[in-house]
Amino acid sequence: MQLTSFTDYGLRALIYLATLPEGELTSISKVTEVYGVSRNHMVKIINKLGQLGYVDTVRGKNGGIRLGMPANRIILGDVVRATEPLQIVNCSEDFCHITPACQLKGILASARSAFLAELDKHTLLSLIDNNPPLLVLLDRPVTE
């Protein structure tokens, strides 16, 4: 299963925000610079993550973005469910005439469930905790 770029960069943005000291603000421009993604695309992603409560957006001259909740409360499976269209194939009878007898849709549904179940085992914190190489790649201070 391949995630859309929206979900992919949404997760990456959350990873970056999780590396900031608690409460510290950064800019969308900084996140786009780190990942080399279009600012317009990242604005849409941050807007959605803000609506979902994962990102806190602060307006004004001294504004910016930061995590909207602690990283240990952000479950990866929840983020993917909220940002990813999870229909793997179109099994409507109007689209596929074998749908009434097809066993593939059940197998794919099980695979999707297993994929999400694995993501549910991990939080945003688990991606950054004790991961100095990640901090180096994100140009964040490494704490011993």
UniProtKB/Swiss-Prot annotation:
Alphabetical list of InterPro entries matching this protein: TR_Rrf2-type_CS, Tscrpt_reg_Rrf2, Tscrpt_rep_HTH_NsrR, WH-like_DNA-bd_sf, WH_DNA-bd_sf
GO molecular function per UniProt: 2 iron, 2 sulfur cluster binding; DNA-binding transcription factor activity; double-stranded DNA binding; iron ion binding
Disulphide bridges, residue numbers: none
Binding positions for [2Fe-2S] cluster per the UniProt entry: 91, 96, 102
Lipid metabolism among keywords: no
Cofactor names: [2Fe-2S] cluster
Residue stretches making up the HTH rrf2-type domain: 2-129
GO cellular component: cytosol
PANTHER family according to UniProt: HTH-TYPE TRANSCRIPTIONAL REPRESSOR NSRR (PTHR33221:SF4), WINGED HELIX-TURN-HELIX TRANSCRIPTIONAL REGULATOR, RRF2 FAMILY (PTHR33221)
Full protein name: HTH-type transcriptional repressor NsrR
Organism encoding this protein: Photobacterium profundum (strain SS9)
Gene that encodes the chain: nsrR
